[in-house]
Amino acid sequence: KTVAGFCIFFLVLFLAQEGVVKTEAKLCNHLADTYRGPCFTNASCDDHCKNKEHFVSGTCMKMACWCAHNC
């Protein structure tokens, strides 16, 4: 009796997890307003975008720092 209850419980739990769909927000790029100089390392650009301009992330593209934000 308890084994059947556990089986039903885990079946419901498993089916509930299947219904959860993860969605990723689209990111849009924006040229960093206050980053100065050529961008050589993604780490420094990412740190600048997150901490100084409050964006999601940052990356170097064509020696310029681009910050990403949710569209």
From Swiss-Prot:
Entry comment on modification after translation: Not glycosylated.
SUPFAM superfamilies reported for this sequence: Scorpion toxin-like
Biological processes per GO annotation: defense response to fungus; killing of cells of another organism
Signal peptide: 1-25
Disulphide bond pairs: C28-C71, C39-C60, C45-C65
Keyword Repeat among UniProt keywords: no
InterPro entries: Defensin_plant (IPR008176), Scorpion_toxin-like (IPR003614), Scorpion_toxin-like_sf (IPR036574)
Superkingdom of origin organism: Eukaryota
Pfam (any one): Gamma-thionin
Disulfide bond listed as a keyword: yes
Quaternary structure and interacting proteins, as annotated: May form dimers.
Function noted in UniProt: Probably has antifungal activity.
Homology family: Belongs to the DEFL family.
Name used for this protein in its record: Defensin 1
